[in-house]
Each structure stands twice: as C-alpha cells, then as structure tokens.
Amino acid sequence: VKLLLKILLAVVLLLVVSGVGGYFYMQKKFQAPANQLVVSQLPLTSAFVWQADTTARPAVAHQALLIPVRVPGCPRACYLQFDTGAPYTLLYAKSVAALRAAYPGTQAALAAPHDTVRNLTFTLGDGQVLARRLPLLRGGASELPADSAAPVLIGTLGSDLLEGRVLVLDYARQRMELAAQVPAELAARATFVPLAFKSRRVMFDAAVQGQTKQMMFDTGSSAAGLITSQANWEQLARPGAQPSTTAVNSWGKTLTKHSVATPANLELGAAKIPLQTVTYIEGMTFMQEMLTRFSGLGGMLGNVPFMGRIIILDVRGARFGLVQ
C-alpha cells in the first residue's frame, strides 16, 4: 500500500511539475523578439488593396490585406501582407531573390547575408520605415509577375508596426493611418474596450451569445469572421446553412478551413456587429494547439466582421475601438 501511495504521489508531482514547466515553456515560446522597426514622419497614411483567391470555390475576394511599399532601387510597387497575427515583420526569400535579379538597383538594399536583410529603409504611404533586421522566410514567388501592374508580394508586415502607436483601419475607404494618438474626431464616435498587446498579439475581450471571451485580432486570417473550436462552430452555425471547406496555406503548411454562416453578433461593449461567418481549422500542429491553449486565446477574429467599418487599434492607450 505504501509503495502504491508513493507511486501515485510521484505521478501527481510529475504532472504538476510538467504542467508548470509546460506553462512557462509555452509563455517563453509565445514571446516576440525585439522590435526592429523605426517609423518616422507620423502620422502616416496609406491605401491598402485586397488580394483575391480565385482558385477557391467559391472565390474569396478578401484573401489578404496588402500594403504597398517602395523599396530603394525598385521602379515598381512592392507589397507586404499586413498580418497582426505575426509578431514581427519578415521578407520572403524567393521573392527577394527574384527582385534582386530583375532589378540590380535593389541588390545593395536587399543584400541578405545569413538570411537577414539589414538596415532596409522603405517608404510606407507618406512615411518611412527603417527595418534594422528582417529575417528571410523560405517561400514567396521565384518569378515576378509578367504584368507590371500586378502586386509583387515580398513579405509580411507584422504587429511590430503597432507597438507604442495607434492604427486606424478604414475598411470602407481601404485606407490606414498610423499615428501617435487617436484622431479626436474618431475618438468621439468610437466605442472602446480594453486591449492587451502581450508578445505583440492584439487581444481584447468581446462577447458572443452573451459569453465574454478573449479574442485575438488577426488580419492575416483575412477572410474569416470568428475562428473557434469545432464545438463552438457547431453551436454558432446558422441552422440549415451549407458549410464550405477549403484548403489554406499557413506558413507553408496546408490546413483545412471549415466555414459556415452564423446569425451571432460580436459584442464590443454596447456595440453589436454581425460576425457573418464562423470557422474552425483542421490540421493544426500540436505546438500550435499548445500555444493557443497557454496563451488563453478564446477565439480569433479576421477582417470580415469589420468590413465597411472603421476600427482603432490604440496600442499606446491599451484600447480597441469600433467607430460608429
């Protein structure tokens, strides 16, 4: 009996230690690296465009939110996908190589010893950004589009752009503004809820069907309303609605996305807006699931609920605003 008790105590202790250790390991894994972006000339404004996915059935009009940038030595506009789910900005190795080959004037600015571009200054709207270090991610297009008017996607613009600043996203006008403070005219019309920016994830509390949960705002999940668990997906689906299933690429890994219409609203303080769609994802790795669990994430919001609206990411003031 004593031996059995000792074994049980040892198992319990092991579970406690591994749980605590796992928590701190995941917290460390979830941390963002040092911010490498220096932004000048605030406030700055820029238009943005939508990249469509015409291969999906049905076609997706708002697959990615792209922001035009100007790279030294390149005569055509390049684009970065704006992804608040990415804690740091990066470039795509194949796209950078193609750009350097097509436009020799970019070779100095886009030199990448040890897979890192250093001290790149690029134009963003009517301002400038100095990126001290930009890692290269395997991927991108090995050839530039033949159509000179087609977007040249060279990387991801992450949430490091937001740190200590205010971002206004005007979906109706396809325009963004990065500033040091919230414009007074918009602040007067906005409903605000508290915002957290731990490890450069945009997190805030919102309610769905009366239940308040912590949500992460991820512009990289562009064509989604609410991404949640399969159980919540089944509960929130509109009765009789036909779900759609599509394959999506997530950092080089193919996942399966299940989406369906929902009658549920997203409640931000006193404001309510339709979620429109609810989604769950198949194919997440164990590490991704553990990161989600230990981050305290209750759901992930894409751009869909905010289409046609104006939102304010006031990271400096720790609040998320919906303009009425």
Report each predicted region and the residues it spans:
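Pepsin/retropepsin-fold aspartyl endopeptidases
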Residues: 2-324
